């Protein structure tokens, strides 16, 4: 029977993890391990595990490893060695206490950014291996409390912020009224069947950032888009269950999202500036549901802005003058390939664009992704210490004249705000839509 792997001391006590561990036995861990490995994995896992030659090339790609002065425990292969390989080596017969560090490593020390996979000579997807560990942890009931609360919200309300149905509709009507002070004829169409576009957002927008809905409504109306938003559950495209390991809820969320679009008979879905939600429809939720492709086309806000500007449906009155640098979200760029379209949009609306180095698919993660920021305040310092290299990257861009950082992803936005304050960078952090709304031509 395996004991806890020797690693750094754990000082964070998480009620979600501690309560789960208290109810574990070695037999239960073994049973869950065998269920996941034998019924939910296959050749992909076997090939990855047996192909790795421990060359260490993945290490130099990892922001956690680089930010911790190349401590091998923070290397991607080190994280897999102390989690999944421990479980595989002992065929799941692990002491309950050993699961604490396994869970903390899987949930809080890997952003699932997949930068390491780009540098692996065999293309091993370590994020997938860590997700297998998270799946086992979820099945054992040892998920960080804050992240589990978000998954509970998804399960109960079909959104991640416990937003009630009437609160959602009230927020849309409120933002419509606010925007009508600027454009009297503006509408946010609800439940309009046959529209060209269903616009979907993530839970924090109606809860904390309603101005983003306002801005989108202005963009849609000025561009003359035939659009709608749903009034029923299915409006939230986010999916933190994807990161907690709750694949069943992940599947429910994706099905509800697409069922809502199908009910409204829209031609396509436009998603707001969110990275993980985008990944959930092109990489994970669709796979769990057995879909080769989404049943209704989905585009990210970056693609939507790109088409509006390229087709001159939105015109720029005057470009944003301050120095701007652009963060490339992992799930949008490394996973979604939207690096050139995001630059087209940025250059179209900003007069002084300063490239961050490295950039595009080689950019460093924000440190919030993969559900790590959703593990809550207890792990904020883990994120800050684990992403010093991102702060250095941002400081270098600032030294070249950047005063504004564009982050076209909600989790990135929040994670970069934390880095900005923690390291005293003094940058203004904006969504692309913030600046597009600011500089676009609007009716008099």
What do the PLM-derived regions correspond to, one by one?
Residues 198, 325, 405-406:
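Conserved beta-strand elements of the Class I
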